[in-house]
Amino acid sequence: MAMRIWHQSFTVLQDLPAYDDALKAHFKKVARPDTEIVMHGMAEGTYPTNYPGTDICFDVIQRLHGPQFLMAGIAAEEAGFDAYAISSIPDIMLRETRASLNIPVVGYGESAMLFACTLGEKFGILNFIEGMNGQLADNAVRYGLASRFVAARQVGFTFADVLQGYSNPAELIERFKVSARKMIADGADVIIPGEAPLCVLLANNGINRVDDTPVMDSLAAWVKMAESLVDLRRTSGLSPSRRGYFQGMPPRARLKELLAFYGQTRLAPKAKRGT
């Protein structure tokens, strides 16, 4: 049965055409034929440049961006989407958005970590944004995976290098392998490429192992997690816990009232059509 998934990026996608094109090609490859992934980014003008990585390094700034993810989730549900995906490895507002929606909500980072645990005993994350490593370590603890987590480390190149790598990937892939082998030597038997721009570059170039160690396709992981949760909801009626402080669902009317009171609704997104 067909399904529609709202993809939410931390980037302004129209500012990054090479990345946007790479994502579209990869989603077409990994999603089921009857799954439609509709790509959405942050509001135009969110960042002073095409690079969001500086903001993502600071907890308080990341939290200030958070309402865009919550409002996108609300828009997804109200537009009839079957699932909502936060496609950014720090899983911005994942817990809060999951508590606020009835449709399945998946996170890029959580999906990658959970799938990594099915492929090996311990995983390590390689990022081009070094300032995010502390948050990823904290997320691993919050997801109950501290004993399976080796480290999150800087991969040895930058976002600009990744963008250039879309047209000339060979050198960047070799540099990634050097960093991966260091992580493997420290005990990782699964490697998670941190940010989605790096993940899609590696996946579109067929990099799924370094020597005998798997390299996670984190984008495919959240796609398959979303498809599975939609299937389980349809076939078995499974849905999230609504018990307690973190899982209790707030009244939608009050949520919208507060978003408007704090001036957030001017950034509320509109659903796009799939391509």
Residue spans for each PLM region:
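Short, acidic/small-residue loops that bind anionic groups at enzyme active sites
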Residues: 96-120, 207-226
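N-terminal glycine-rich phosphate/adenylate-binding segment common to multiple enzyme folds
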Residues: 63-101, 105-108, 189-201
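C-terminal and late-domain segments of enzyme folds
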Residues: 8, 189, 194-201, 215-244
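Active-site rim beta-loop-alpha module in soluble metabolic enzymes
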Residues: 141-199, 203
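Glycine-rich, highly charged phosphate/nucleotide-binding loops
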Residues: 56-75, 171-177
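Short, glycine-/small-residue-rich phosphate/pyrophosphate-handling segment
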Residues: 118-154, 225-268
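Conserved beta-strand elements of the Class I
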Residues: 6, 123-126, 189
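N-terminal glycine-rich anion-binding loop in soluble enzyme alpha/beta folds
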Residues: 1-63, 128-167, 265-270, 275
